[in-house]
Swiss-Prot record:
This is Mitochondrial inner membrane protease atp23. InterPro entries: Peptidase_M76_ATP23 (IPR019165). The keyword Membrane applies. The lineage of its organism: Eukaryota, Fungi, Dikarya, Ascomycota, Pezizomycotina. The active site is at E191. Its EC number is 3.4.24.-. PROSITE patterns: ZINC_PROTEASE. The keyword Lipid metabolism does not apply. It is an enzyme of class 3 (hydrolase). It is a peripheral membrane protein. Its main location: mitochondrion. GO terms for cellular component: mitochondrial inner membrane.
Length: 293
């Protein structure tokens, strides 16, 4: 099928204090503008590389030695992220093989995955092992510049994702981020809702005309995939709220996804767009009749 990329997980706060980030250790993206545009450069995200003298994580020694250093508090939160990323690289083949086995099992045995696959096929789309692929998805420690005129400090986030959908390529499952088969099922269902929406309505993924398309499909995907059900929110994320928990989760995840669009200005803009389409999109359960998960 011809399933603009979306992601099912946005940046996550790492808890790394900005004061521990000397500018000499920060690298900028290779696609940055020329140095003459210094004002524009200040607005670009910067990505941190590991410095053992700062983080305590030394990739030249055995992994178990670094693990012991983590347990004894000798490695900073930033160093833990670098350690995790290196372990993902080392275990890439194992993680992808497990992801592919779980994907194939879900295609055969999961009621929600089989139902969505059938509905995609009814719209002349095909989702199978050729365009639902498992890959390692690198995470990056991002330095978000603060507004110096307002006295804001730089903010540190870890940018990672669980999966994605592209109309030109299909569905991506981030093998290194999948905790278990149930997590993969939620992620795959989320992206399959995007695929159905694209075949049904030709979604404006990048928000070139309007961000409302992106907001609506993100609301629907989070609502119908099961990723916001109470058991996952409470046990996995530690959110034990009983009232409006489901709605709050769907709204929050939709806002995070809309913020990743290039035409979205900030969280205020994303929230405004999500609120504009909330009533109509949250009540639209197609291709299901009810919310089953």
């Amino acid at each position: 099928m011809s399933p603009a990329p979306t992601t099912s997980a946005g940046p996550a706060s790492s808890g790394i204090p900005p004061s521990s980030l000397p500018t000499s250790t920060v690298t900028e993206d290779d696609t940055k503008p020329s140095s003459s545009s210094s004002k524009a450069n200040d607005l670009l995200p910067r990505y941190l590389t590991n410095d053992p003298s700062r983080t305590g994580y030394d990739p030249s020694i055995q992994w178990w030695m670094n693990y012991f250093k983590i347990l004894t508090g000798q490695i900073t939160p930033e160093g833990v992220e670098h350690y995790r990323e290196d372990r993902y690289k080392a275990n890439e083949a194992r993680d992808c093989a497990r992801c592919e086995a779980d994907r194939d099992w879900l295609f055969q045995n999961s009621p929600v995955i089989r139902f969505l696959r059938e509905k995609v096929a009814n719209l002349n789309g095909v989702l199978d092992e050729t365009n639902v692929v498992c890959r390692r998805c690198p995470s990056r420690i991002v330095v978000i510049p603060g507004n110096k005129e307002k006295g804001e400090e730089d903010r540190i986030e870890v940018a990672r994702q669980g999966g994605g959908f592209s109309p030109d390529h299909g569905i991506l499952l981030c093998a290194n981020e999948m905790r278990n088969r149930g997590h993969l099922e939620d992620t795959l269902a989320h992206e399959m809702v995007h695929a159905w929406d694209h075949l049904r309505w030709k979604v404006d993924w990048f928000g070139e005309k309007s961000l409302r398309h992106a907001a609506c499909t993100e609301i629907r995907a989070s609502m119908l995939s099961g990723e916001c059900r109470w058991t996952r929110e409470s046990i996995v994320r530690g959110n034990w709220t009983l009232t409006q928990q489901f709605q709050n989760c769907v709204r929050m995840r939709a806002i995070q996804s809309v913020m990743a669009r290039p035409t979205c200005k900030d969280d205020v803009h994303a929230t405004k767009v999500v609120n504009e389409v909330w009533d109509s999109c949250f009540s639209d359960k197609r291709p299901f009749e009810e919310i089953y998960r």
